[in-house]
Regions:
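A transmembrane helix-and-boundary motif of multi-pass membrane transporters/channels
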Residues: 1-237, 241, 248, 355, ...
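Secondary-structure capping and boundary motifs in well-ordered enzyme cores
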Residues: 80, 84, 130, 252-259, ...
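Soluble C-terminal extramembrane regulatory/interaction domains of multi-pass membrane proteins
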Residues: 195-196, 200-210, 253-375, 620-746
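Long, low-complexity, intrinsically disordered cytosolic termini of multi-pass membrane proteins
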Residues: 233-236, 587-628, 661, 671, ...
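Acidic, serine/threonine- and proline-rich low-complexity regulatory regions
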Residues: 242-254, 601-617, 639, 703-710
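Composition- and surface-driven signal marking solvent-exposed, interaction-prone regions
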Residues: 249-252, 256, 277-279, 283, ...
């Protein structure tokens, strides 16, 4: 017995660390990437394909599609994309390579369209099929322009190589530690709810004890929640592009994201007003019961649940009904008539905030039970607001830049014959197309692109020198495969957390492809290695010049577009635009993207303090979004008996709201916020006077509790919207965007 007891801990020590290591997403993805690369290389060598490097490169790019979904559709579309690109390349090179006036414009259109459809969202549900059209056309043209007589054999070789890589990646993604976007969304949603629960708890406690200030941890929670929303936004885009199941239920996922954002912002409303202790004391027990029920509901929603399992019931609705009954009882005692107007409005505002928390928690419960889960029958999909695809002008520009880079590269190959010809068009096209993902993944887009290109050139020179020194050791097949596996493992380990490809990750991918293409298992001349890396450098130079001089992707410009988009959608919401679901979804996503972009504005004119102010402005806009949304949803609920008094004041306020929105938009459009903003004090004071008139006349005395609640809640929403707008104006006035809003930092 003693020996067994002593042996058990040893076994556990050997077993559990291994299990823990394999549960790490970085290690899993590193292994998967290594396996996909080796499988593609093995099949290419087994089939005696001409250039195995194209198979390995295709596998690397395709492994960026992390999630399992509709494997049959993916396989068919990737095969069709590859074959279609090959036929297009064969047709262009075979018939028109000797007629540049036809060949180059047609080639430009094909590659441009492929790049555009790869990035277009949400219309492109099979993006990698379009990518493979462009990649295969480019690969056939790369080799075919110098040997058009053999274009059919070249097209067949490139087709088989790219199909090898595409199918290898699809096989590994599906069979080895498969990832499901719907399951990861559910887990990330629970994590975001846990973060929101901490803030709700803080603000509920502050409301109960009658204070407006909250602990300093609230700021950190706000930042953590922004990070959680960023993860969910990236999952929305990736899942919609890679999984037909996820895409079919996109409206449900969008609604979950909107409710989650509203829930978080409703918590901030709780401590916006300080309620008199004398009034809070009358409903103390009921408010505490509601707070306990909210905490219980969060515990239920954030707990792990098996797919198909019903959520446990909670006491939230019963607790709030008891609270509502107690408030009605206090109202009948005419406590609010004797209290000052500000006190009454503050209490009813808190009541409305608690009710909004209840409604959003109920909505999230309903949405959570309706989310598709693995192994369960799929719920009926809801219609999505984006029925028809729209033109995405950003990706039109990206496609044109990619097409222009590819054309310049082909012209160089045809008439100048530079070193490393196989790498030039590929490097130029991919670096030109992937501009926006650089920003999403933590890069700066085309900002400082010449500096980055210079540093990358130095890194490529170092890689060439290292490869010249190590080539003799890679002649052994086993050593070569082990080296490739560990390189791919290292690459996957360090890139899996990024939401997209960065500039450096893409350069690394193409360098790995060049390494495989040199085939170090056989003696490789130093000049061949140098020529191959020179080709990468030339292609990078073409992409850098085109990307930086033609529609450059700059974080400050993306931020400008996001801010203008937020303001225009808020104005549309105030104006009664019928497409509310679309507007709400955009208003939930755009601020998250804006916060991502703010972190990437790194230049001398934008200091740390300036970035902090920009982040504060985006968060103020998020608060404005929440207040405006609630205002629009409630303004038609104004009791008819109060409408003749309040409606004219509300309409005047809305006109002034739109004026401030126009001024803010003009500031960001012109790149200069050094101006005065209109004041809302007079219009808000007129609303308060109208409310006082209603109070003195006591026209709501004989109405149900819902009448004063709706009236004062709506009044408070107008006040909150006005305060949020003035806060946005105050923050905008302190910005110095004229120093960095333009095209700087080459």
């Amino acid at each position: 017995m003693t020996g067994k007891s002593a042996a058990l801990p040893v076994a556990q020590k050997l077993h559990w660390p291994l299990i823990g290591a394999f549960s790490d997403l970085r290690i899993r993805y590193g292994i998967k990437l290594g396996l996909a690369g080796l499988l593609a290389l093995y099949c290419a060598l087994l089939l005696r394909l001409e250039h195995p490097s194209w198979a390995v490169l295709t596998a690397l790019v395709m492994m960026g599609s992390h999630y399992v979904g509709a494997i049959t559709v993916k396989a068919i579309m990737r095969v069709l994309g590859t074959i279609g690109g090959a036929l297009m390349g064969i047709w262009l090179v075979g018939d028109y390579v000797s007629t540049p006036a036809i060949f180059l414009p047609t080639f430009f259109l094909v590659v441009t369209l492929a790049g555009y459809k790869f990035g277009q969202f949400p219309a492109s549900q099979v993006p990698y099929a379009y990518f493979l059209v462009g990649l295969t056309t480019l690969s056939v043209a790369t080799y075919g322009v110098t040997d058009p007589a053999d274009v059919w054999q070249i097209g067949l070789n490139r087709t088989l190589e790219i199909l090898d890589g595409a199918m290898s990646s699809l096989l590994v993604t599906t069979l080895v530690w498969p990832r499901y976007a719907r399951e990861e969304f559910a887990e990330s949603g629970r994590a975001a709810l846990r973060t929101a629960s901490h803030l709700v708890s803080m603000h509920t406690e502050a409301y109960i004890i009658g204070r407006t200030n909250v602990p300093v941890q609230a700021e950190q929670i706000d930042q953590d929640f922004a990070g959680r929303l960023s993860v969910l936004k990236n999952l929305l885009q990736a899942g919609a592009r890679e999984s037909t199941v996820f895409s079919a239920h996109l409206s449900t996922y969008n609604a979950f994201l909107v409710s989650l954002t509203n829930l978080f912002r409703a918590a901030l409303d709780l401590s916006r007003h300080q309620v008199e202790p004398s009034i809070l004391g009358r409903v103390q027990h009921e408010i505490q019961s509601v707070a306990a029920a909210i905490s219980e509901e969060f515990d239920i929603l954030t707990a792990q649940h098996r797919p198909g399992e019903k959520l446990s019931p909670s006491r939230l609705n019963e607790a709030f009904a008891a609270f509502e009954e107690k408030v009605n009882e206090v109202r009948c005692q005419e406590v609010f008539i004797a209290a000052p107007l500000d006190t009454t409005r503050a209490f009813y505002a808190g009541f409305a905030a608690l009710r909004l928390l209840r409604d959003e928690l109920n909505n999230i419960r309903s949405l959570s039970e309706g989310l598709p889960r693995l192994g369960q029958p799929l719920p009926e999909p809801k219609p999505h607001w984006n029925f028809l695809p729209t033109i995405d002008w950003f990706w039109v520009q990206a496609g044109i830049k990619g097409g222009l880079s590819a054309v310049i590269s082909i012209v160089l190959l045809k008439w100048i014959n530079p070193p490393g010809p196989a790498s030039i068009p590929l490097m130029a096209w991919t670096l030109s197309v992937f501009g926006r993902p650089f920003v999403r993944a933590g890069g700066t887009g085309d900002l400082r692109s010449f500096q980055n290109a210079f540093l990358a050139t130095l890194a490529l020179v170092a890689c060439a020198a290292l490869l010249i020194l190590t080539t003799p050791f890679l002649a052994d097949y086993l050593v070569m495969n082990l080296a490739l596996f560990f390189i791919l493992f290292w690459f996957g380990f360090h890139t899996i957390r990024a939401p997209g490809l960065t500039f450096w990750a893409l350069v690394a991918q193409l360098t790995i492809s060049t390494f495989v293409g040199l085939n170090p298992q056989q003696p490789v001349a130093s000049q061949t290695i140098i020529d191959s890396f020179l080709g990468l450098i030339i292609g990078m130079g073409i992409a850098t010049v085109v990307g930086r001089l033609i529609w450059p992707v700059l974080p400050q410009r993306l931020l400008r577009d996001d801010l203008l988009g937020i303001l225009s959608q808020i104005k549309a919401l105030l104006g009664g635009d019928p497409h509310r679901e679309k507007i709400q979804t955009l208003l939930a996503i755009l601020p998250v993207e804006a916060l991502q972009v703010v972190r990437q504005i790194r230049m001398s004119g934008c200091s740390e303090g300036e970035r902090a102010t920009l982040q504060a402005l985006v968060r103020a806009l998020q608060a404005l979004v929440t207040q405006t949304t609630e205002l629009v949803y409630r303004r038609h609920l104004l009791p008819e008996i109060t409408a003749p008094i309040l409606r004219p004041q509300f309409e005047r306020l809305e006109i002034e709201f739109e004026q401030i929105l126009d001024v803010l938009a003009e500031c960001f459009r012109r790149g200069d916020c050094r101006r005065e903003f209109p004041s809302l004090r007079g219009a808000l004071a007129a609303v308060d006077q109208a409310v006082e008139k209603i109070r003195v006349s006591r026209i709501l005395s004989n109405q149900s509790l819902e009448a004063p609640v709706r009236t004062l809640d709506l009044v408070d929403r107008y006040h909150a919207t006005g305060e949020a707008l003035e806060e946005c104006g105050r923050l905008a006035r302190t910005l110095e965007i004229q120093r960095y809003w333009g095209d700087y930092a080459l």
